[in-house]
């Protein structure tokens, strides 16, 4: 399996850790961001990101905004996540 540089974006530290631990065990390099604004800063600085795993609901800049901004610049694959369930 190809080793990837993956940006994991989630305001919940437990979710970031869960995703990071799993992917690092597979040999991937993980970069973490706590919100959309930090994710965009990291994305601009790292042109070799292979995948973005992105929470939908975050403060400052949500996942949809990040997705639109990234899509305007790149075709990097994006996986959108949410922990929100039906009540």
Give, region by region, the residue ranges found by the protein language model.
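Conserved sequence signature across two-component system core domains
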Residues: 9-10, 33, 52
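Charged docking surfaces used in two-component/phosphorelay signaling
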Residues: 17-25
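Short hydrophobic/Thr-rich beta-strand motif most characteristic of the beta2 strand and flanking loop
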Residues: 27-34, 42
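Acidic catalytic/metal-coordinating carboxylates
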Residues: 35-38, 62-65
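Conserved phosphotransfer cores of two-component systems
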Residues: 44-47, 69-76
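Active-site beta3 strand of CheY-like receiver
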Residues: 47-53
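Active-site residues of response regulator receiver
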Residues: 55, 82
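Receiver (REC) domain active-site loop signature in two-component systems and cognate sites
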Residues: 58
């Amino acid at each position: 399996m190809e080793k990837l540089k993956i940006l994991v974006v989630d305001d919940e530290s437990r979710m970031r850790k869960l995703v990071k631990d799993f992917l690092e065990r597979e040999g991937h390099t993980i970069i973490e961001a706590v919100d959309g604004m930090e994710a965009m800063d990291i994305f601009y600085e790292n042109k070799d990101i292979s995948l973005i795993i992105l929470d939908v609901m975050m403060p400052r800049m949500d996942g949809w905004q990040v997705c639109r901004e990234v899509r305007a610049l790149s075709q990097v694959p994006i996986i959108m996540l949410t922990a929100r369930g039906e009540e």
